[in-house]
């Protein structure tokens, strides 16, 4: 029977299956951070349980950390307590922790791939919705809740139903200056933020085949913004090249065996997909969100839509509501709208290729004195590499602040945030109301 990549990985990890559509899956890698794990560890203590396989669990501090200093008190008392609790929990249960003083510390979805923890064919979970990032390697990866974090810690398994399969094929020649972020925003805009609900999305096409691993991670990172359980891309030579000689990657004779297995991780020719779409990006222009949902997105040369042009009352009301919150008028070009802050960072766009691309645009240029701009590398390793290449100097000379690794202004959980009414051009993945701070406006 022909299978999709998702079905192959799912089926190979089933340890128990009931008569319904539910199975217990073995989990290969469990990633944790300071925000969604404290209650899970407290519950383990209360029930007098241990962590079943601590060597398959890795922790980092990212959501709450200050990117201005390594002081865990800098982001407030709640953040301090969560980080102190993570240190305590990892010490007690013998879990590897990348804390703020570790040179490899960074955003969980940046450090796991760059260290080779993320491998094709794995099942990977984390108490974070953008765990779908790791699907770029052909790994079944998805976010889980705190009660599920506890279950994985205690059993190294997770109860999961089988999701449907969606195939998205991207065709056309990629226009100059168009990035993976533009492509995924365009797809979300075309298909909607709920089209992927109940599905695992696999991406296909020559556009995908020619993408670097960092571009593929951006694509899969935002599959969740379509409502999908996860995003997947089959591993290939680009994947193998990226993973070779990483700290946690197989080596020696195990490397060849790994390649032999990884080469089987692709959807069969006649595999059945419940839904499929073909997206042509030949004429794609740079994309930017104007509203409060990732599917409220337009090309940079388009106007904010007029609600009267839509038949659906839901869409009309959504446009009016979003414009009111964002302080925008329908029919406006976003190129005519000024911003207060600029943020380059997040698990979507804080890798070395992202920083190289941004630095090329900023070289020998200066930002407005009225704009505060920050660059936050996704990890200590990214920061170190960028500084070796002199990228930090380009950003600083342009007027940006060069920061320490962390989630930073992607979300208002640390001391990098928008003030009420401030507008930000952001490289992050969500433009929800208040995402970057109460009353903040995100593009």
UniProtKB/Swiss-Prot annotation:
Gene3D superfamilies: Aconitase, domain 3. It comes from the Bacteria. Keywords: 4Fe-4S, Amino-acid biosynthesis, Branched-chain amino acid biosynthesis, Iron, Iron-sulfur, Leucine biosynthesis, Lyase, Metal-binding, Plasmid. The keyword Iron-sulfur applies. Its cofactor is [4Fe-4S] cluster. [4Fe-4S] cluster binds at residues 347, 407, 410. It catalyses: (2R,3S)-3-isopropylmalate = (2S)-2-isopropylmalate. GO terms for biological process: L-leucine biosynthetic process. Pathway: Amino-acid biosynthesis; L-leucine biosynthesis; L-leucine from 3-methyl-2-oxobutanoate: step 2/4. It is an enzyme of class 4 (lyase). Binds 1 [4Fe-4S] cluster per subunit. The keyword 4Fe-4S applies. One of its GO terms (molecular function) is metal ion binding. Its EC number is 4.2.1.33. InterPro entries: 3-IsopropMal_deHydase_lsu, Acnase/IPM_dHydase_lsu_aba_1/3, Acoase/IPM_deHydtase_lsu_aba, Aconitase_4Fe-4S_BS, Aconitase_4Fe-4S_dom, IPM_dehydratase_rel_enz, IPMI_cat. Heterodimer of LeuC and LeuD. Belongs to the aconitase/IPM isomerase family. LeuC type 1 subfamily. Catalyzes the isomerization between 2-isopropylmalate and 3-isopropylmalate, via the formation of 2-isopropylmaleate. This is 3-isopropylmalate dehydratase large subunit. It comes from Buchnera aphidicola subsp. Uroleucon erigeronensis.
